[in-house]
């Protein structure tokens, strides 16, 4: 499966740095996360991915500095790919830099909102995942726990 989230209400004031926006997506079925790809434009600075589990535990899964010149998919190794029970909320946090200090910023004097043009900005992300059955999730979780306790888990 493949999921893309938009943050169409993006609001980046002129000259502002570290402008935060948040997006959420609920995993309806047990899943294994395969990859994460942040996507912003010239003012994109950083994007982080958190899992908010049904028991309200929060785990940071990925946090990357963003560079518009590099469109990178961060793939997880099989042994550490996040295993997500049904009901897990994916929380994506994005930061933008609309200041003069951002060398990629075409004009820090202007307010910037969502748009598809490079001179606009966005805070999108793509999640690549596949669904698992409850039994598959339990078995994989148990196997990882066993490997971790035996010291045989590979990263």
Predicted regions and their residues:
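Extended, compositionally biased non-globular segments
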Residues: 35-118
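Extracellular and analogous surface-interaction loops
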Residues: 22-32, 80-85
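Conserved, well-structured core segments that form or line functional sites
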Residues: 7-11, 26
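Glycine/proline-rich low-complexity spacer/linker segments in large multi-domain proteins
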Residues: 101-143
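Solvent-exposed, conformationally flexible loop/turn segments
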Residues: 14-17, 87
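Short beta-strands within extracellular/lumenal beta-sheet-rich domains
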Residues: 16-27, 74-76
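Activation corresponds to long, low-complexity, non-globular regions
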Residues: 138-155
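Conserved small/polar residues in nucleotide/adenosyl-binding loops
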Residues: 1-5
């Amino acid at each position: 499966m493949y999921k893309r989230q938009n943050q169409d209400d993006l609001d980046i004031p002129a000259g502002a740095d570290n402008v935060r926006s948040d997006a959420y997506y609920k995993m309806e079925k047990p899943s294994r996360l395969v990859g994460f790809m942040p996507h912003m434009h010239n003012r994109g600075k950083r994007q982080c991915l958190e899992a908010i589990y049904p028991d309200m535990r929060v785990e940071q899964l990925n946090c990357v500095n963003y560079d518009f010149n590099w469109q990178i998919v961060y793939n997880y190794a099989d042994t550490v790919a996040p295993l997500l029970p049904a009901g897990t909320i994916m929380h994506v946090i994005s930061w933008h830099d609309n200041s003069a200090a951002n060398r990629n910023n075409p004009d820090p004097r202007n307010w910037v909102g969502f748009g598809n043009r490079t001179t606009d900005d966005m805070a999108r992300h793509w999640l690549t995942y596949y669904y698992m059955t409850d039994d598959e999730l339990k078995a994989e979780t148990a196997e990882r726990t066993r490997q971790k306790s035996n010291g045989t888990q590979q990263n």
